[in-house]
Amino acid sequence: MSRFLICSFALVLLYPAGIDMYLVGLPRIAADLNASEAQLHIAFSVYLAGMAAAMLFAGKVADRSGRKPVAIPGAALFIIASVFCSLAETSTLFLAGRFLQGLGAGCCYVVAFAILRDTLDDRRRAKVLSLLNGITCIIPVLAPVLGHLIMLKFPWQSLFWAMAMMGIAVLMLSLFILKETRPASPAASDKPRENSESLLNRFFLSRVVITTLSVSVILTFVNTSPVLLMEIMGFERGEYATIMALTAGVSMTFSFSTPFALGIFKPRTLMITSQVLFLAAGITLAVSPSHAVSLFGITLICAGFSVGFGVAMSQALGPFSLRAGVASSTLGIAQVCGSSLWIWLAAVVGIGAWNMLIGILIACSIVSLLLIMFVAPGRPVAAHEEIHHHA
């Protein structure tokens, strides 16, 4: 079992590492490529676009051909794209490399969640996804620090060589450690069960909405945090970094505590708690009389996401024993596209950073609470976790 957990964690971590590690070198990259920092900030969106594009096909291929045939090319593409970015001499080539990086990371991301669905029952999967969420929260803190240390001695290209080395590690794990977990091709008697695993299932769609809104909350916070903390609240850059590190600490603490909470409380209770924390955060930020109270509201955001997201993802994947790859892709596409659409629309309409965050917090909590209360899980899939895997 440990081999599946290690491989899944490694496959997932390419995604945040690809986002956060290069940011510290952005000014130097812009100077060398004769582009403005503003022009290169689109590299974040291009990377997410690559991930979304990968998810359009990765899940279906993983369900038909297996998890390894998607993970291995995905890791290889991430390596090649990282090297391509390091060799880029124009901003256009750099952005093309970032898109390819996103494609590779997206393939690995989809496979990681499919593997966890293949190998873990509902309760263990919820615990592992909560732990994974906590580990993922470390990357935005550690990656820029590692990038800074690298750039003390080496040029910005070394950041992408470091990402390539990470990709090589994931490729080696996928080649030599990971075993295939895709369920064996269903017999004729299993066809009705395969056909019953519909992406239009009300319970699955409710969890897609809940997880998409939750990701929209956390990405809205990350996207608006420089404006909120430095421009509106007046913190210096060093203080901003400290606050973001502390919020990551809050996220890790609650993520690592959630598996223990699942041994005491029902998953539904934790999901309701998560949304109540979001609602409390929105109200706190809306009526906040001081910076200290606002910072408390921000900690509630991190706590709410950490308590509920892993549980909701586990519930979303639960009904899919034979189509876990497609379900994972659908979740990923909805989360990436939904959150990006909200942030873009809010910017186009002219909603300020503060109101943007408050609005998504309150909307997410109200909609999600209604879905949790009124959309119950259906009948468990027969032979839910008793799947025969390929050797």
From Swiss-Prot:
GO terms for molecular function: transmembrane transporter activity. The chain crosses the membrane at residues 4-24, 42-62, 69-89, 93-113, 131-151, 158-178, 203-222, 245-265, 269-289, 293-313, 331-351, 356-376. It is a multi-pass membrane protein. GO terms for cellular component: plasma membrane. Gene3D superfamilies: Multidrug resistance protein D (1.20.1720.10). Its main location: membrane. Residues 1-3, 63-68, 114-130, 179-202, 266-268, 314-330, 377-391 are cytoplasmic. Keywords: Cell inner membrane, Cell membrane, Membrane, Transmembrane, Transmembrane helix, Transport. Residues 25-41, 90-92, 152-157, 223-244, 290-292, 352-355 are periplasmic. It is found in: Cell inner membrane. The keyword Zinc does not apply. Belongs to the major facilitator superfamily. DHA1 family. MdtL (TC 2.A.1.2.22) subfamily. NCBIfam families: PRK10473.1 (NF007782). This is Multidrug resistance protein MdtL. It comes from Shigella flexneri.
